[in-house]
Amino acid sequence: DFGDAGQVFDPIPYLGYLAASTERILLGTAGIVLPLRHPVTLAKEAATVDALSGGRLLLGLASGDRPGEYPFFGADFDRRGETYREGVRVMREIWEQAAQGRIDQDSFLPAPVDGTIPLIGIGGAQQSPAWAAENLDAHMTYHRAGPQMRAVAAQWRAISLKPFMTNLYLDLAENPDAPFEPIRLGARVGTTGLTDYLTGLASAGIAHINLVLRPGRRDVEDVMEEIGQDVIPALRARTASEPAGADIRS
């Protein structure tokens, strides 16, 4: 029971809008349900967004764990892991051929800016950790309490130096010194406690943290401004020497 209906907008047109509205931030999904999309179509759509954004796309791919969605697409829920692997293979092959100019009669354009697009496995995606480490560029998992998060990150680090990522559902308190209060998949906390907590996650080897502001009770722009002014600079100063793993896209 995920307790939500997912993203309101379809991610691909939404990413096109964001690509035209921004200049520097990375754009990503967390994630598109790959077994419910044709991989050739998705490869074309993703490459288009990547080209329009100047190479800023990170493509997070999930297997989809809501059985009720699959009948609408005539897809086999029980084979979603196999379909996922095949989709990744097809997209990688298409982008490689496009980047090398090896598609002649039915040319695939545009090619991704850097020849390929970073693929992030969202959740387990019905795959073994070994397969994910070999075939994907990063792994993102749902948030657990601090000690559990450290253990999960260590398991990934044992098999891969590729980036390990997590979501953190955040309700940022107005009081910067508000204590850390766990909520489902995240926390209610002030900026001071948030900085401390994110520092701990970075020291555990977590390279990227996706802050989900959906549970928040404050204006989103105010929250983003506070994080930008009070949290990110302090976090950068504290974690400058942390070996958090390779970056996905500079």
Q: What are these regions, as identified by a protein language model?
A:
Residues 1-250:
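Active-site-adjacent structural elements that line small-molecule/cofactor binding pockets in enzymes
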